Amino acid sequence: MSIYMSRAELEEISEGLITAYANKFSNRVIQSIDIEHFITEFLMLRIEYASFAEDDAGRIGFLADGATPLLVHQDGKIIPFVFPKDTIVLDKFLLAEKEQGRRRFTMAHEASHHILSKMYAMPSEGRFHAEYDSERSYSKEELAQMFASVEWQADTMGASLLMPRRIIENALAKYNQSNPIRVYGDNTITSKDKAVIRRMAAYIGVSYTALVIRLRDICLLYTSPSP
């Protein structure tokens, strides 16, 4: 059985889920996706916060399977704790206001693991969302896990759930008269367009970097040869 879906397939599934969510909760899909509400009221998953004590500080989110323990700080000790199945556990530091973008994306990533396990009719298993740290040395096994197909799929679906095309197009209309953002060469964006992206990101509730990646993925970055 294949355990791979293309970007187009992931986009289509995400669009279908968001459409079903919007039909059920018509006041929830306006300028951004209330990902916490989507998770708890539509997917019917729980969200909890804990102080992670894993060796890998990049592990900031976890989808519990009811069997795999998560190392957490509790009462001055580090203990293995098993959370109930279908619980998304986030590191407590993500509650800070400045971490809103990372918090929302981590929720979407873990929710995507749940959705994908249902699509593949596979039993759910405990999965971490780990952020890549360019200053850290990773083992081959850690790198393989981080960039595994299932993680790419969860990242791709998470971005699609959090930033549906319709939401981005609405923000682009509001802040850039529906014009695509121009990129010169491979990565150069003017200060003016960077400011537009920052306003769009704040409006949607995501990070600048996540939005740039999403704009590129859905072909709303226009490549120009020179300024």
What are the residue ranges of the model-derived segments?
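Active-site hotspot residues in diverse enzymes, especially metal/ion-binding acidic/histidine motifs
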Residues: M1-S224
